[in-house]
Amino acid sequence: MRHYEIIFLVHPDQSEQVGGMVERYTKLIEEDGGKIHRLEDWGRRQLAYAINNVHKAHYVMLNVECTGKALAELEDNFRYNDAVIRNLVIRRDEAVTGQSEMLKAEENRSERRERRERPEHADSAEGDDSNDSDSSDNADE
């Protein structure tokens, strides 16, 4: 069996069907003796260019180990499913189980956002305390 990285884009109107589609595709691979090494749902993202007048799509990535027969059946499912607007299959030398660069970048972005928001709250809390003491000093005078 060979290792593959599969990315497919689902029409944004069918985003709620992604879970069922992924379940169907993983079942197809596992029934043929294959294995899912990594499954990542990247969610709805902006496309670089419009595909069939659609500007966003729901991205899903799978790293699998499967036979050529299972892969051909999976590609047929992609081809005849109108909800899948694009797919990409890349043959890999070995199984990739680590987190993808997309998810790492997303986590870094959320961590930076949290750090950026934290000091603002701390500054405003300190500023409120100093204003209270100033107003009490002014009241004494």
UniProtKB/Swiss-Prot annotation:
Short name of one Pfam family: Ribosomal_S6
SUPFAM superfamilies: Ribosomal protein S6
Basic and acidic residues bias: start-end ranges: 103-124
GO-annotated molecular function: small ribosomal subunit rRNA binding; structural constituent of ribosome
GO biological process, alphabetically ordered: translation
Composition bias, Acidic residues: 125-141
Record-linked PROSITE patterns: RIBOSOMAL_S6
UniProt keyword terms in alphabetical order: Ribonucleoprotein, Ribosomal protein, RNA-binding, rRNA-binding
InterPro entries named in the record: Ribosomal_bS6, Ribosomal_bS6_CS, Ribosomal_bS6_sf, Ribosomal_S6_plastid/chlpt, Transl_elong_EF1B/ribsomal_bS6
Family recorded in the similarity comment: Belongs to the bacterial ribosomal protein bS6 family.
Protein name as catalogued: Small ribosomal subunit protein bS6
